[in-house]
Regions:
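Interdomain "pre-motor" coupling segment immediately N-terminal to P-loop NTPase/helicase cores
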Residues: 1-45
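N-terminal pre-P-loop "Q-motif" helix
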Residues: 54-77
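Walker A/P-loop
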Residues: 74-96
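Short glycine-/polar-rich loops that comprise or flank the Walker A/P-loop
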Residues: 104, 131, 190-193
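Conserved RecA-like ASCE P-loop NTPase motor core of nucleic-acid helicases/translocases
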Residues: 105-113
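Residues immediately C-terminal
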Residues: 113-116, 142, 172-174
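Inter-Walker segment of RecA-like/P-loop motor cores
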Residues: 123-160
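SF2 helicase catalytic motif II
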Residues: 153-197
């Protein structure tokens, strides 16, 4: 037996009720039966013409890094951005976000901490004035659709096979690090490329 959501194959996590076998390893995300795929949303993919405005210009090194990120993503490669805290990693990915949206791709930005989700949402909304940027985290789950989705790692379970580009920040931090369930949910949320941001790889 294998859970198609979290990848679990350990027998001790499978239980049987009147509806059949189901996985309890990822039960916090809702009941899913053995052999059952997570619900897939009908996703509208339409080009969104947008531009972003920064509060300060990027340095030549930052511009070069932003261009290289776009280049690798255009070649369908996953990217790791390793830079110190405060180095402007969020600003470095804005060009990639813009170009993805213009092509009609769905973009998600996942991070471990709720407070940072709210902070990133505000920064992205300030930069991309014409986008509907939404935060999906504890206390903010009524609206789950927008032009750009910023969410905690846990909330990725809502987005099975949705994102063409998934930006993942703080992948080295709790609770994502070492959590096999969250890793599988993140894998299933993205049908394209992943862009990892970290200060401590």
């Amino acid at each position: 037996m294998q859970c198609l959501r979290c990848g679990n194959t350990e027998k001790r996590y499978f239980y049987k009720d009147a509806k059949g076998w189901y996985c309890r390893k990822c039960i916090m995300f809702g009941r899913i039966g053995v052999g059952e795929l997570p619900e897939r949303k009908n996703v509208c993919r339409k080009p969104i013409h947008t531009a972003y405005q920064l509060k300060y210009p990027l340095t030549p090194a930052q511009k070069r890094c932003a261009s290289e990120i776009v280049m690798y993503l255009n070649h369908h490669q996953d990217v790791l951005v390793y830079a110190a805290c405060g180095a402007g990693k969020t600003e470095l990915v804005m060009e990639a976000i813009k170009q993805s949206l213009v092509k009609g791709s769905r973009v998600g930005f996942a991070i471990s901490r709720r407070q940072v989700v709210l902070e990133i949402r505000e920064r992205m909304q300030d930069a991309f004035k014409n986008l509907n940027v939404i935060a999906v985290c504890e206390g903010y789950t009524e609206v789950t659709e927008g032009d750009l989705i910023i969410c905690t790692m846990h909330q990725l379970y809502r987005y099975h096979a949705v994102f063409d580009l998934l930006i993942m920040d703080e992948v080295d931090a709790f609770p994502y690090r070492g959590n096999a369930v969250l890793k599988q949910i993140a894998i299933h949320a993205c049908i394209g490329n992943r862009l990892y941001l970290t200060a401590t790889p």
